[in-house]
Every structure is written in C-alpha cells, then in structure tokens.
C-alpha cells in the first residue's frame, strides 16, 4: 500500500496514551528560542541519512533534524564501516559555504558513490578513499546495507501503511571506454550497479538519460542531476547513487498552526506541534525523537548555545547513544520544504581526498584509460509536514581522462 503524504492520514494514526500532567514533560523547540538564524542544516546521512550503531537514515538540522534507519538488530556495525566524524566534518564544511541557506546533505549517498570508485582504486588513491570511508571493504558494507534497506519496504502492521526506503546505483560509460572486467563485476555484485554505454559527445542525450534514471529512482523528487556543461571532451565515466525515503508518522499526529509565525530572523512559516517519543540531552544540545512506520525515526536536535555552531560541537554521536531522559516531550517545529545542490570537489580535497582529483590518481582498476575524478555533485530535497516525510538524495561522480604527460 503506497501512502501519499500530501493527504491526511488520520485513519492510520494510533494515538498513544499521554502521561499525566504532573509527570516529566518538557517543552521543546519553543519559537522564542533562537533557531540558528533562519537556517536549517540537514545532515541526511547514512539516510541512509548516519549513526554509529547501524546503517541508517539520518537527518540533522540546526534545530537539527535527523531521520534514523535503526538497524542494530540487523547485525550491521556502522561504527566499523563508515566514518561518522568525516561525515560530520563534511556537513560543517558545506554549511560554511552556504551560511545564508538551508542545507541538506546525504553522507550515505556520497559514501556509496565513493565506495564504487574505491573498487577500482589502487595505491595512495585507494588508501585515501579507505581512510575517508572508514573501511578497506566498503563493498561488504554496501551489500549488507542494501539488504537491510529492502526489509523496510513493507507494510507496518501496527499502523496499516508502508514506508518506502530505496537505494540505487548506476555506471554511465562513454563509448570507447572499456571498463575492467573485475570492476564491472564488483559494481554489479556489491552495488547492483549496471553499466550503460552512452555517447558523451551527445551531451544533451547523455544528460537526459542520466536524469531520467535520477527522476525514476527518487519518485520525481529530484528530476535531474546532470547538465550538458558538466561534460567535456575528456569526460569518460559517471557514477551515480540515489536514495529515497517516504513515510507517514506512526504515533501522535502533528497539529498545524493556522497562522504563520516567525522562524529565525526573517522567515515566517507555519509551525507544527506534537508529542515526541523520547527526549535526549547533553551539555551542548537537546533532542526529541518521533517515529515513522517500521521503526524508522526522526530526531530533532536543538543546540543550547546561541550563535553559530558546528555539528561537531554538539557531540551528536554521544547524544544519540545516550539513554532518553523522558519518554514523552512536547515538540514544536516548522514545516520544511527545500532542496540543496552542493559541488563537493573542493571540500573533499580539503579534507583528505585531493589525490582522487589529481593526475596522480590511480584508478587503473576501473578502466583501460587513466582517469581521475573531475566533479562530485550532490542534490537533495526534503518535504516534511504534518502527514509525513519525503527525502531524496542523488550523488554524481564524473571522471575524466587525465591530461597527456
């Protein structure tokens, strides 16, 4: 059963019994609290969106929102598979470059795209990618993760509707480039990535083909990732990853204000109020959790300090590993609907991956020509309202022939 989150789902809502008024409840995200200017920083991470206890979906925002795919019971140890700290650092770097904008970022989508090229990397290039990803066998993690993802596309018998969580990968190969047989096999076996031959000299048709794949795998939420000016005479290969999540809320409904209220310094928006399921707190931040179907959850994080902050300063890992202080909390937050486009090449170079973009890169395990990464682009979109959430990410890694020596 497919749920359309643009329609109200009152018939599906299961109202749980609320605690007595004299029990511990906390008002959370009051509109009089500062909300980090008018910014929402979304860290949609190992959304596959990233926690350290299992492969996840995470979203962090400046009131940080975090959606988590809780798969600890699936015996996948994310601590040993994905470098959470690198993802937090990268999110903070993206925020620095977009100080006046809401942002959303998916570490998992990026990691899967980088994980694919790591399959054909050697020497220093391989070491740099392994260091960033936090494992020398990302392919094994990818296989397990994709199997876990599939188990969440089922109807939740408690609430009568289905969450949707899907991941896809693809290889787009310029005519005349020959992929190494082992690389192509590894990409298909571990990432379910099929290779399609295109004529990159026909830039418009190449982009249309890739964008059609992008549109299909995000249910239309992200209709395109490539533009013709992203390709040139040296472009030889494009690797893409997509992530898509959709679900309604599984517990108490959100009530929406009739009038818009101030959000941050300038923006006005409608707010939603509800009962959250858990309340967390550390020295730097407070957080609430609210469930979707199939034990997926959203976590909103509010920093205690005024002014600018980084995700690193909030000790998100410690916060989310802690036991909740209360099992109910009054929560209030704005509706969210925005998208982000982030060119990640410069940021990745600054945090340790400069080799993959240089003529010193060794991707001899990928193709019969010497190639390096020329561009890493990610697009994300989030729609969150009283009925549920839709979130998507697409990452495209473009590779070129190296310049002649």
Predicted feature locations:
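Short, Lys/Arg-enriched N-terminal segments with co-localized hydrophobic residues
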Residues: 2, 7-14, 18-36
